[in-house]
């Protein structure tokens, strides 16, 4: 029985057009193939000349996105090159430092390949400006000290002798006591104690000299030491790092670059030369290159397995070699067309859209299988060759076109999403599917004509028919329907839970890109070890400021955040106080020290008696004080005097003269060192190693702040918390963590939105295909009033309307209206959507039961399963609509749906052998998804249709009078349906290509 809206009872413009095209192609196969060959050659040439590849992850993001515009601004100012981290591990600090020096020297010798080499912090030019790191108060103190010693600086070294210095200390203490200034008293006593300890130690051992002069440049010495060469090592000294950027960008689809290749050679050669150390590489460029290289190897291996597996399935399904070969040739031509189409529309492939070939292989071959199965079925019913091709196009052509359009629209809906990578994949895959459908009606009939036109039906293969399954469904449709629906509900429900009154998915989304990498990849393991050893991440957020003052303020705010481990910026390398506050003081100090005289060849003669008297006076003066320091100084002075008194005069002169010489040399050395760090010219970023200042200050004067996380932000929850915190300080912050977070959220939302949009569009297309023009207009126009009213009420309430909700509302109302005007056709539309909806529900349940999560690699399962499921549903329901008499799924439909699903499962399942975990997860979820849709399409849906057919066959008004076999049918299509009705099997006829 047929419904009123079956294709054969309504307008047959599309079937007639497809039949006409097929008749022309089969009558002129050589001419057709020549035209197709020229068009294919043109597509290949255009592709080879103009198609490019974009392997950067940032190419997947819409350039209009605010967060991506901030990233591009950062890249424009500071360069696109991310740091490569060379990790050196050895038994001790010396071995690690030697390896770092060797690697650094090799990198610097190849400047065309490597830039911004940071193996040591080497800023010698900053040493001469060390005073600028002191506070104004400390500088004033130094200036006062120099003011008191001005005569000594200018050459009167007699004033710095032992006796003279002792008298100065005595006068300083007397004056401080008279002024009643405890602070100055303590200062004087500390200096006396320093002199007493120094002299006492020297008298005991002339090889042990300690300077008696106060260290007025101690902070400067510290700064100078920090500014000298320093390796980047862990506290243990057994792990060190060299940071470098690659100058040569990646070439081609593999993501490899000359810089990375050479860098691996340098690391390998150095590790071989210095056998004690191990050298590895990590960093974002290395992680991405390793991922791309591994995935390319895996895809190549999977393609070989897929090709062989699909060929084997077609061989078993069609029981011969010839017809599977024709289908694969047609698919190859369509793929070349798709490449040309991609070149003309998009112009490039990215790391997501490069998978379009796998998608088209999985979906495009379906059209050829459906076409070939029906053609062979008709030939086995002794139809004439050219007539069988025309009837094939008339019977399954509508289903192929409907499936192609709905599947194409499912992908094209991705263009409405925010994620550019998904949108481009949607355009390429959507257009490619339509090209596969065109090739099915042009290339395939021409190839079949050249192959089969002189063959008798007895020499053609007999495809798989699914006889047992068809009989089971025909005999027990109610039982099969109930059992399968119950199973789908029970299993599918495992994927969801009820929490706080809302239904939530148990299947989670894993955004950690490291979990997609192959196990055992060196760069991933090094990154994890590096994080553990240093509590540092390779990922960091980037904040850009306009001035050093703003950089310091913002850096301090970042450092106060709980989730921030450390902050790096150029301001931390520069003096804390601006030159306007310190420059005059430093100029004064520099001017005084510029007069520093050399030490005299002979030092002032020493007078032991005078020295003893002065030290005795100091002893008595200190003895009058009661502080601990005074007690210590008094004790040391007493001991010193006792030692001197035991010596003969010549010995006293000799030892005290030696001490005085060492004392004057120490003062001169201290003043000289102070002079060396008193350069008054301001410290600038260019005083530092270019590898440092280029990373933190742009040529335009922008200042960069790197904010490192305390936790591992490859995981989504720590990443989101970290981003929330750093955005509280700088809402415009960017960097790889923000890019990863926003891109992962965009790709997740884009796939889900694309699936929703596609479901809405596919439903509307199916309604347009099923309902006649008059009711269709009402069906499409009536819901606009409801949607418009809902939108108006939302606006009136001050709420923003959700586009997805409005589209869903429009679709639901359209279906309800369509049910009123044409119940049977609308019911068929809903049943067509049963495989993707019920199959998807079943798929999520299996995911939950097997602990499979969605991730950025396998989210493509959503539009793919919708396309594959709708494709199966369209062919099964079209088969139902074409059937006259009691319904039973036709052998060609069973054969085609089974083969298309199995070939898709084989194609995607071949990825399970991959080492790249992203490809493994992609293959696994697609095998489960396609298998779920296959189960619903072959078992549940035919059983439901069989029940519907039995119900409608009991109504007398819908019975069709039996046709007279002696009268020819009025329509060519009736020949097909009558033949199907009168035959259950094709007959087992031998094939010449078995």
Regions found by a protein language model. Give the residues of each.
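A general structural motif
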Residues: 67, 514-528, 681-688, 748
């Amino acid at each position: 029985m047929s419904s009123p809206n079956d294709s054969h009872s309504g307008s047959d413009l599309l079937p007639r057009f497809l039949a006409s095209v097929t008749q022309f192609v089969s009558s002129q196969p050589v001419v057709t193939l020549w035209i197709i060959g020229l068009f294919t050659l043109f597509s290949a040439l255009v592709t080879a000349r103009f198609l490019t590849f974009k392997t950067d992850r940032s190419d997947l993001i819409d350039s209009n996105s605010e967060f991506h515009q901030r990233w591009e601004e950062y890249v424009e100012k500071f360069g696109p090159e991310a740091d490569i981290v060379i990790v050196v591990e050895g038994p001790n600090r010396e071995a690690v430092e030697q390896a770092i020096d060797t690697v650094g020297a090799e990198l610097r010798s190849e400047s065309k390949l490597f830039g911004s080499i940071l193996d040591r912090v080497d800023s010698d030019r900053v040493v001469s400006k060390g005073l600028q790191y002191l506070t104004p108060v400390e500088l004033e103190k130094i200036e006062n000290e120099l003011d008191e010693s001005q005569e000594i600086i200018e050459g009167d070294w007699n004033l710095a002798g032992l006796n003279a210095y002792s008298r100065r200390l005595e006068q300083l203490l007397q004056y401080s006591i008279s002024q009643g200034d405890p602070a100055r008293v303590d200062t004087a006593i500390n200096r006396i104690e320093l002199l007493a300890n120094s002299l006492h130690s020297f008298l005991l051992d002339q090889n042990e000299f300690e300077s008696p002069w106060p260290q007025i440049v101690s902070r400067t010495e510290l700064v100078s030491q920090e500014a000298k060469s320093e390796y980047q090592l862990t506290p243990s000294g057994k792990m060190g790092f060299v940071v470098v950027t690659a100058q040569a960008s990646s070439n081609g689809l593999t993501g490899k670059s000359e810089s990375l290749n050479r860098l691996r050679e340098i690391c390998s050669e150095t590790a071989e030369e210095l056998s004690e150390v191990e050298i590895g590489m990590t960093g974002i460029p290395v992680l991405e290159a390793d991922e791309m290289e591994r995935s390319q190897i895996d895809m190549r291996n999977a393609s070989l397995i897929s090709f062989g597996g699909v060929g084997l399935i077609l061989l078993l399904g069609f029981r011969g070699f010839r017809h599977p070969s024709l289908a694969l040739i047609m698919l190859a031509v369509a793929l070349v067309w798709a490449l040309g189409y991609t070149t003309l529309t998009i112009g490039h492939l990215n790391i997501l859209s490069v998978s379009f070939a796998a998608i088209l292989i999985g979906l495009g071959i379906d059209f050829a299988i459906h076409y070939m199965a029906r053609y062979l079925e008709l030939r086995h019913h002794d139809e004439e060759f050219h007539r069988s091709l025309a009837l094939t196009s008339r019977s399954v052509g509508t289903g192929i076109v409907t499936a192609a359009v709905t599947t194409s629209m499912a992908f094209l809906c991705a263009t409405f999403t925010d994620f550019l990578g998904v949108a481009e994949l949607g355009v390429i895959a959507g257009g490619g599917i339509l090209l596969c459908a065109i090739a099915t009606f042009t290339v395939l009939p021409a190839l079949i004509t050249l192959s089969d036109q002189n063959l008798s039906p007895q020499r053609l293969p007999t495809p798989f028919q699914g006889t047992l399954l068809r009989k089971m469904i025909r005999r027990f449709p109610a039982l099969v329907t109930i059992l399968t629906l119950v199973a789908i509900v029970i299993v599918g429900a495992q994927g969801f839970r009820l929490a706080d009154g809302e239904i939530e998915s148990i299947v989670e989304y894993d955004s950690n890109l490291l979990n997609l990498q192959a196990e055992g990849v060196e760069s991933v393991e090094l990154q994890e070890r590096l994080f553990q050893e240093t509590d540092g991440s390779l990922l960091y957020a980037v904040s850009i400021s306009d001035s050093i003052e703003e950089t310091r303020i913002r850096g301090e705010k970042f450092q106060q955040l709980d989730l921030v481990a450390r902050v790096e910026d150029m301001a931390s390398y520069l003096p804390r106080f601006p030159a306007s506050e310190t420059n005059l003081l430093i100029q004064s100090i520099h001017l005084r020290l510029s007069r520093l005289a050399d030490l005299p060849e002979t030092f002032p003669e020493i007078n032991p008696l005078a020295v003893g008297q002065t030290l005795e006076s100091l002893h008595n003066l200190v003895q009058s004080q009661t502080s601990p320091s005074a007690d210590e100084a008094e004790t040391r002075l007493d001991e010193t005097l006792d030692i001197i008194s035991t010596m003969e005069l010549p010995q006293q002169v000799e030892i005290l003269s030696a001490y005085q010489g060492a004392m004057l040399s120490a003062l001169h050395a201290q003043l000289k060192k102070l002079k060396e760090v008193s350069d008054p010219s301001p410290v600038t970023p260019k005083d530092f190693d270019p590898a440092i200042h280029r990373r933190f200050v742009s040529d335009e004067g922008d200042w960069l702040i790197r904010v490192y996380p305390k936790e591992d932000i490859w995981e989504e929850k720590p990443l989101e918390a970290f981003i929330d915190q750093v955005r509280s300080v700088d809402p415009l912050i960017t960097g790889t963590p923000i890019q990863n977070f926003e891109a992962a959220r965009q790709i997740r939302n884009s796939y889900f939105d694309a699936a929703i949009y596609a479901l809405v569009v596919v439903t509307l297309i199916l309604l347009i295909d099923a309902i006649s023009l008059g009711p269709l207009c009402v069906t499409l126009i009536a819901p606009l009033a409801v949607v418009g009213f809902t939108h108006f009420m939302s606006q009136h309430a001050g709420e923003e309307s959700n586009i997805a909700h409005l589209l869903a509302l429009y679709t639901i109302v359209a279906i309800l209206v369509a049910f009123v005007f044409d119940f049977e056709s609308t019911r068929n539309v809903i049943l067509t959507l049963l495989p993707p909806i019920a199959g998807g529900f079943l798929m999520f349940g299996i995911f939950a039961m097997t602990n499979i999560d969605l991730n950025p690699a396998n989210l493509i399962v959503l539009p793919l399963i919708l396309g594959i499921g709708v494709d199966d549903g369209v062919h099964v329901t079209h088969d139902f609509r074409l059937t006259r008499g009691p319904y039973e799924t036709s052998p060609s439909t069973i054969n085609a749906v089974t083969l298309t699903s199995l070939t898709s499962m084989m194609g995607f399942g071949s990825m399970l052998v991959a080492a790249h975990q992203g490809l493994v997860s992609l293959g696994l979820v697609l095998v489960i998804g396609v298998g779920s849709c296959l189960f619903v399409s072959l078992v549940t849906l035919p059983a439901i249709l069989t029940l519907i057919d039995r119900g409608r066959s009991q109504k007398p008004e819908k019975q069709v009078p039996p046709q007279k076999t002696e009268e020819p049918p009025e329509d060519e299509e009736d020949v097909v349906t009558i033949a199907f009705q009168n035959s259950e099997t094709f007959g087992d006829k031998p094939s010449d290509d078995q």
